Amino acid sequence: MKSLDDLDFDNRFARLGGAFSTEVLPDPIAEPRLVVASPAALALLDLPAETSDEALFAELFGGHKLWSEAEPRAMVYSGHQFGSYNPRLGDGRGLLLGEVINQAGEHWDLHLKGAGQTPYSRMGDGRAVLRSSIREFLASEALPALGIPSSRALCVIGSSTPVWREKKESAATLLRLAPSHVRFGHFEYFYYTRQHDQLKQLAAFVLEHHFADCNAAERPYAAMFRQVVERNAELIARWQAYGFCHGVMNTDNMSILGITFDYGPYAFLDDFDANHICNHSDDAGRYSFSNQVPIAHWNLAALAQALTPLVEVDELRASLDLFLPLYQAHYLDLMRRRLGLGVAAENDHALVQELLQRMQGSAVDYSLFFRRLGEETPERALASLRDDFVDREAFDRWAEAYRRRVEEEGGDQESRRRRMHAVNPLYVLRNYLAQQAIEAAEQGDYTEVRLLHQVLSRPFEEQPGMERFTRRPPDWGRHLEISCSS
């Protein structure tokens, strides 16, 4: 085991030079204290699960102390925001502190969010608030537990530093981990500023360190883009299958690695609503739940445009054309498993789509439906779920088709139950649960956020005494729309 003050650094991105990032020191927050830490994220750096030295966490991630090998830098990038190109974005409040190598030889970026102003702050104060930091922490650890690729969160540090958003709040920092923080927007920045040498340098860097297997291809950059398409097709399929709505799918929020990145006003669906908008700033619904698939394809096309100096257009188009069929195959496989079906059949797509149509407008809890479906035999489970649907005759027709499908596959109920419970979570990160934890933390009580994080780290297992985390939201907590303000 390593200790927190003795990490091994190898700052590869910093060595790219000043065209890619600017050296900036963290601006300390006042009276830093540890709010919550993730044992699973600590393990990625070979650190012990217990956080016995909370003062050291607070010093390092509150901006008061740096490792001697750290090289904090603010990265420059651009991006399309709500469909419009913004030529200069960059890390406006976050710093890449450096890259740590664990005992397995893996590199992990240490990125401190809320570290103060940078050259890219665009009139902002460079701070993050406790509210948004807790939300990002919880999601960063909840999604991987569900099998959804994501950046990770090591810890949240609170403070007494005041910041003003819609109201006065307290500043916080979040330490984010990821194998890379390179975004689609990095490539767009060098493309639109016509810095094609730097564009190629960035592509070579990403190829060498994150897509090394593509080096053997006849055209490595084309092979790399194809893998980016493949990874994003699987990622979005997992979002859709588990009812995750990102909320701000700007190209600067898209990771080149195909992982969930830059959490803002996200939400997991409570009642199923294909048109759910979780971001109250998204008046047109560009990033609604149902739009995430076409928007991901649009974003990949924006990345493809930025790669045209390196890859032939026909090759880029061919890879883009793979996105939808790859997405559909991944999504159908995930939904088949959620329904307890192990063998593909011709009518599976229709079975899934019919279920979603029956759910729409019926106030059916998306996550609990699948969990309850596996609790008992299909006949009993379907009978108990029937009352949740508005058009019960239509549901009965779907239920009969599903029952026949299960019967065709055969197998015993206990095996079916175990199989379904392994992929259908009992605990999901509902917005109202996060809000309750945030409100307690804002009063200095971190018990709830730590407990919620602990529960969400094992979403498929029944945890005695934690029944309250399985409940549907109260009236005040239904269909919460979250602000981008953070």
Swiss-Prot record:
Entry annotation: catalytic residues: 252 (proton acceptor)
A GO molecular function held by the record: magnesium ion binding
Binding site for ATP: 90, 92-93, 113, 125-126, 176, 183, 262
Catalysed reactions, semicolon-separated: L-seryl-[protein] + ATP = 3-O-(5'-adenylyl)-L-seryl-[protein] + diphosphate; L-threonyl-[protein] + ATP = 3-O-(5'-adenylyl)-L-threonyl-[protein] + diphosphate; L-tyrosyl-[protein] + ATP = O-(5'-adenylyl)-L-tyrosyl-[protein] + diphosphate; L-histidyl-[protein] + UTP = N(tele)-(5'-uridylyl)-L-histidyl-[protein] + diphosphate
InterPro entries linked to this entry: SelO
The keyword Amino-acid biosynthesis is annotated on this UniProt entry: no
Key word Secreted present: no
Residue positions binding Mg(2+): 253, 262
Protein family (similarity comment): Belongs to the SELO family.
PANTHER family given in the database record: PROTEIN ADENYLYLTRANSFERASE SELO, MITOCHONDRIAL
NCBIfam families assigned: PRK00029.1, PrtAdtaseSelOPseudom
Name by which UniProt lists this protein: Protein nucleotidyltransferase YdiU
Upper lineage: Bacteria, Pseudomonadati, Pseudomonadota, Gammaproteobacteria, Pseudomonadales
Underlying gene: ydiU
